[in-house]
A protein has these predicted regions:
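Sec-dependent N-terminal signal peptides
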Residues: 4-13
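N-terminal leader/targeting segments and the immediate start of mature chains
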Residues: 16-57, 70-71, 203, 208-213
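Gly/Pro-enriched, hydrophobic low-complexity segments
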Residues: 19, 126-205, 210-213
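Extracytoplasmic
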Residues: 39-41, 60-62, 69, 83, ...
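Beta-turn initiation residues at beta-strand->coil junctions
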Residues: 48-50, 79, 92, 170-173
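An acidic-aromatic
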Residues: 62-110, 179-180
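Flexible, surface-exposed loop/linker segments and immediately adjacent secondary-structure boundaries
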Residues: 103-137
Length: 213
């Protein structure tokens, strides 16, 4: 009985901790966000893994992102996603088609231009610990959505303690899937024209255009 009471007490403490807006976590998140905003534009190579222990899923691929303000271009093995802040293009080379849609800034889909400030709205945050990851000391912070029906129930961010850049982040969904993005190469303050963030049909003659707007 005493054991059950003790376990219940620990659960209570854990839930209470996650209900807080941890000032230590906020200080790190604010510093990280300010750093990326000051860059203007950046480019990053990354690895992506999808794991699910129950379904025995373990997938990995590499990609590249270019971000400038609200605009981004995401190059993946089987698709390229381009967003100019208003319109979203998804180019599928194997299908020889491009889907065009209006950009929804409130979508729960992974958005490279928003991950650095996602904590500012509808999330609670908690500093967990300092941990050495890949030889780099990182501050580990959990973001927990305030909405119970959110697509992801937790996002864990590993932020480099020395310079407040993002080392990696993992998104946990209710189906047991874990989506991990790890930055493998980072180039800040790059020069890139706004036209880079718009799909150019001249580069893909004969492609089928599917306009979903």
């Amino acid at each position: 009985m005493k054991h059950l009471v003790f376990v219940g007490f620990l659960v209570f403490l854990f839930q209470d901790a996650l209900s807080q807006y941890d000032p230590k976590a906020l200080a790190t998140l604010e510093a990280m966000s300010a750093k990326f905003k000051a860059m203007g534009a950046f480019e990053a190579n990354f690895s992506y893994t999808l794991t699910n222990d129950v379904d025995n899923i373990n997938e990995e691929f590499k990609g590249k992102m270019t971000v400038k303000g609200d605009k981004y271009r995401l190059a993946l093995p089987e698709q390229e996603v381009i967003n100019n802040g208003t319109t979203l293009w998804t180019y599928l080379p194997d299908a020889n088609e491009v889907n065009i849609d209006n950009y929804d800034p409130n979508s729960e889909d992974v958005n490279p231009s928003k991950i650095f400030e996602i904590y500012k709205k509808d999330f609670k945050y908690l500093y967990l610990k300092d941990e050495t990851i890949g030889g780099v000391v990182c501050e580990v912070i959990d973001l927990v959505p305030e909405k119970t029906d959110a697509q992801f129930f937790k996002i864990r961010m590993n932020i480099v303690k020395r310079d407040k850049t993002v080392k990696s982040f993992t998104m946990f969904d209710k189906g047991g899937n874990r989506y991990t993005y790890t930055i493998t190469e980072f180039n800040p303050n790059i020069k890139v024209d706004d036209s880079f963030f718009a799909y150019d049909p001249k580069q893909h003659p004969g492609v089928e255009i599917i306009d979903l707007r």
